[in-house]
């Protein structure tokens, strides 16, 4: 819709398309148009709206299925009594209200990443991790599902809740079943692919291949991905519904909670399932292919359920590209981590990597979800050129403009330093890692964290609008890329910080010992 109406432009109010009646406009300098219809304004007065007859031939695009149910209403001659509901207005938020709503989930997410690091420090000494070392390769791939699936689910459901597509029981049930079925399909497929990657990467270095170990990895990966997605999906649905009922913007709380629980639950499940299956390695080996076959056999059921919902049908067919590419990006970050911590001088980096990666991914996921919700409230993907700038925005526009998205970017950026100070202090109190929290270390660590989040927030501002302009729903496509970039930037900048610290002489007996 153009911002400068001219004769024969198409006008539409509240997503309603009433039938046109022949009439001509008597406004000054305006030629007769195809037809007009009357609407009731906010004060009850009649408002005459000009409608071009050819507008009725315009269909709804498939990739905008999420908005499909709310963008059209039944035509009626009596539009005053048979109009579609007005689209909900965005919540009025100040910087203080945004910060207040984000703070608790942000801290919860950070403590979740700290807990996940502590769990990994314990389970790495279990026999299954010592004998089947390829399980370590599964860790970053399965933890990446948090950004690829759960956080995308949280963003998608938050947008649906904010634009009124979960207000009735029928809409709510359809949205829940479709999205839960969708993430089960994605989790099963990604879990299977992750196990194949683990087998290949474990075989390449020494040329050793074990069929029982391969089945163990496949069963552990698929079962972990399936159960983790099921549990986290149910939690996300409860959080979003509860947030909407008490007047909190779900965009501010859903994605951080998904992140906080995602790492911990996924890592705990992977450790427990792989350990339990490993105990049966020498007795019931046939249980491994049976577990794999069971979850694969459920795929057709989830596909049928996901196809029934317009909100997930398009994602089922086109939502695989970001998931696969995000795994590749995260793998590069994993390669940096592997090469860095394998050097005894930098072994202390391991405990901080989940924290810096998790915090950056959580903050950018909140911002991406908020921008996507704002765009959905103002139109449909690909149809509003004003919402999709052709060029990259300037940093001043991203962080210092008066609009609500710039305000939220400033709030999220200001949370980085106090949040990381709390998490570093927690790690120190729990005696995690091998690094003394000296002043110079904290300065380098904070510099890396601030630079990571600054880059991510800027990329999110550009990427979400760019995807919107190309007709892609940012809820489905942006967050996997952004969280994967967060892993890559966080790991790379942290590794660079440790190398610089070593070069300038910060080599006390604790750093990297």
From Swiss-Prot:
Residues 1-42, 60-91 are annotated as: Disordered. Highest expression levels in heart and testis, slightly less in skeletal muscles, prostate, adrenal gland and thyroid, and weakest in the hematopoietic tissues bones marrow, lymph node, thymus and spleen. In the kidney, it is expressed in the distal convoluted tubules, macula densa, and thick ascending limb tubular segments of the nephrons. Keywords: Cell membrane, Disease variant, Ion transport, Magnesium, Membrane, Nephronophthisis, Phosphoprotein, Repeat, Transmembrane, Transmembrane helix, Transport. Coiled coil: none annotated. Residues 13-24 have a biased composition (Polar residues). It comes from the Eukaryota. GO terms for biological process: cellular response to magnesium ion; intracellular magnesium ion homeostasis; magnesium ion transmembrane transport; magnesium ion transport; metal ion transport. It is linked to Nephronophthisis-like nephropathy 2: A disorder with features of nephronophthisis, a cystic kidney disease leading to end-stage renal failure. Nephronophthisis is histologically characterized by modifications of the tubules with thickening of the basement membrane, interstitial fibrosis and, in the advanced stages, medullary cysts. Typical clinical manifestation are chronic renal failure, anemia, polyuria, polydipsia, isosthenuria, and growth retardation. Associations with extrarenal symptoms are frequent. This is Solute carrier family 41 member 1. It comes from Homo sapiens (Human).
